[in-house]
Structures are given as C-alpha cells and as structure tokens.
C-alpha cells in the first residue's frame, strides 16, 4: 500500500471521531453559554470575566493534530519503548534519581533520555502532560498517591510536554483553582519554567522524577501524546499503553496493572 493510500486511510479513520469531538465541544459551549445568560439575567456576580468558546478554529486544528499524533505514534504495546530525548527538571520535593536507591543532583535543562530512568528490575510509569491540561492536572493528586503507594516496586517519571491550552492559543476558561495561565513555549527555558510552575502548585513525592520534552517535541510525537497519556515501560518494552487523552486517560487502569503485578510485594514491604 502506497504512502498516499495509508494517509487517506488514516484520514478516513480519524474523521468520525474528529467530528464527534467537535460536536461534544459545540454542546459544551451551548451549555456554558446558556448558564452564562441565566447568570447574567439574574445579575449574578459570577458572570464577571471573559467567556471563552472551546469550539474555535484553533481548537479544531489542535484536535485534528492530536488525532494525527495518535495515528502516527511510534509506540506500540509489547514493542520497544522509544528512548526520547528530554531534559531534567528539578523536583523541589527531592533530587532526581537515576535508578532505584540512588540520587544525583541534576541541573535544569541537562540533556538525558527517557530510558535513562528505567531500571531493568522495575517497571517505569511514565505520565505525560502539561499545566494547561485540566484532565491531567485534576489527576495529579491521584498520580501522587500512586507514587507513594507503589514506589517500593516501581519507578515514576513525569514528562512535561507542549501546552495543551496555552493562554495565547487554544485557551480554556480560567475559572478553576486548577487553571494555569501559560503561554506557548518559545524555548527550553520556557518549558522548564512552566514545569516548575506546575510543581509549585502540585507537590509530587520525591520518588517521582520530572523531565521536560525537547522543543522538537520528540517525546510527544513518539508516544502520540498531544494532551496527556500514561504508559508503563518494563525491560525496555511497553507493558501498558494508556489511551489518548483526555477521554481515555485513565490512572485507574495503571493502578489495576500495578496491583495485579505487584500487590503481594507491596504488602510485604
């Protein structure tokens, strides 16, 4: 099958889910607009502030790009884990570890690779996301709990990627305590600074290492993240591959995988 035929087939596969996502956002906008009008008529103070639509031309481009990233991702369940190039981000709660039981001081922006954090004897849970992705940030407390409960048998890595909803791009309503105002990253320093902003709001356990994707977004592309995704690497292979976010981003599946494979060992420790 030729390249054009493959691209056409992928496009035809993406179109139905792309339009269903657009329909969901249109319904969401309608509900929010109706709520906004009701509050306005009641002269409620809650109406103060800008109302932002989710279904915009910028939003549609981002959604389409996310499906393309998922369709062309390198990562496959059971196959070799892509060893993407990333940079260190210091976790204020502790030092970055290289392998279980050892700690090294690292400098922000120091180059490394994703599999540098993998131990052949332990699974590595890799969580991809950004501060401006509400489904990702809302699950960070649950992710922190996973780290605390399973750090005796597994390693954890948070990979900070390109912003899902930058304030100067496809922004989301900022009426939540979980919301962040972060612009598009212009350089690696911007991305590391955004990661630090996230860590200041959500303190991760010291057992969780933190890195940032390079500005070429090679980790994002290889793992088909777009918004958020979680996977588990074991012996350099993909042992678990989570679904495409936001709708199929599921930390409960990660918990079940860890409990199934390591619950007995956790009880002994």
Curated annotation (Swiss-Prot):
Gene3D superfamilies for the chain: Glutaredoxin
MF GO annotations: thyroxine 5'-deiodinase activity
Enzyme Commission designation: 1.21.99.4
Sequence ranges on the Cytoplasmic membrane side: 35-269
Residue ranges crossing the lipid bilayer per the database entry: 10-34
Reactions accelerated catalytically: 3,3',5-triiodo-L-thyronine + iodide + A + H(+) = L-thyroxine + AH2; 3,3'-diiodo-L-thyronine + iodide + A + H(+) = 3,3',5'-triiodo-L-thyronine + AH2; 3'-iodo-L-thyronine + iodide + A + H(+) = 3',5'-diiodo-L-thyronine + AH2; 3,3'-diiodothyronamine + iodide + A + H(+) = 3,3',5'-triiodothyronamine + AH2
Main EC class the enzyme belongs to: oxidoreductase
Active-site residues (renumbered): 133
Post-translational modification: Ubiquitinated by MARCHF6, leading to its degradation by the proteasome. Deubiquitinated by USP20 and USP33.
Record topological domains on the Lumenal side: 1-9
BP-aspect Gene Ontology terms: hormone biosynthetic process; thyroid hormone catabolic process; thyroid hormone metabolic process
Assigned keywords, A-Z: Endoplasmic reticulum, Membrane, Oxidoreductase, Selenocysteine, Thyroid hormones biosynthesis, Transmembrane, Transmembrane helix, Ubl conjugation
A single GO cellular-component term on record: endoplasmic reticulum membrane
Function description: Plays a crucial role in the metabolism of thyroid hormones (TH) and has specific roles in TH activation and inactivation by deiodination.Catalyzes the deiodination of L-thyroxine (T4) to 3,5,3'-triiodothyronine (T3) and 3,3',5'-triiodothyronine (rT3) to 3,3'-diiodothyronine (3,3'-T2) via outer-ring deiodination (ORD). Catalyzes the deiodination of 3',5'-diiodothyronine (3',5'-T2) to 3'-monoiodothyronine (3'-T1) via ORD. Catalyzes the phenolic ring deiodinations of 3,3',5'-triiodothyronamine and 3',5'- diiodothyronamine.
Quaternary structure and interacting proteins, as annotated: Predominantly monomer. Can form homodimers but homodimerization is not essential for enzyme activity. Interacts with USP20 and USP33. Interacts with MARCHF6.
Annotated protein name in UniProt: Type II iodothyronine deiodinase
